């Protein structure tokens, strides 16, 4: 019985491997053909010669973070901890 189980498992894994391999090969073939087709279109001059503002890369960009602190702010974790301590009888923080 052990040999039959191994054979069935081996066949299943072979099918999974085959499907994966053919999927990868098919997607590579599709990708290469679509890229070749787009490069032929660009060589023909069918694409616009004037670059638009959207297609240009930004020359430089940055991220700015603004942090605003409130004077009497209590974090949510501290609120939950105080609520938990009020139910369990533990010492909570005094306001």
UniProtKB/Swiss-Prot annotation:
Membrane topology term: Single-pass membrane protein
GO MF: protein kinase binding; transmembrane transporter binding
Domain of life (superkingdom): Eukaryota
UniProt keyword list: Membrane, Mitochondrion, Mitochondrion outer membrane, Transmembrane, Transmembrane helix
Intracellular or extracellular location(s): Mitochondrion outer membrane
InterPro entries linked: SMIM26
Keyword Amino-acid biosynthesis part of the UniProt annotation: no
Main location: mitochondrion
Signal sequence region: none
Residues that span the membrane, as ranges: 13-35
UniProt tissue specificity: Detected in kidney (at protein level).
Further comment: Suppresses clear cell renal cell carcinoma growth and metastatis. In renal cancer cell lines, interaction with SLC25A11 maintains mitochondrial glutathione and enhances mitochondrial metabolism. In renal cancer cell lines, interaction with AGK promotes AGK mitochondrial localization and inactivates AGK-mediated AKT phosphorylation, leading to inhibition of AKT signaling and repression of metastasis.
Biological function: May play a role in cell viability.
Stated name of the protein: Small integral membrane protein 26
Organism this protein belongs to: Homo sapiens (Human)
């Amino acid at each position: 019985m052990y040999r039959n189980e191994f054979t069935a498992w081996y066949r299943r894994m072979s099918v999974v491997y085959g499907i994966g391999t053919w999927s990868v090969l098919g997607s590579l073939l599709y990708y290469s053909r679509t890229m070749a087709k787009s490069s032929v279109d660009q060589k023909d001059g069918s694409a616009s010669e004037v670059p638009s503002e959207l297609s240009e890369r930004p020359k430089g960009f940055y991220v700015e973070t603004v942090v605003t602190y409130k004077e009497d702010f209590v974090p949510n974790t501290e609120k939950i901890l105080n609520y938990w301590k009020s139910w369990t009888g533990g010492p909570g923080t005094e306001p």
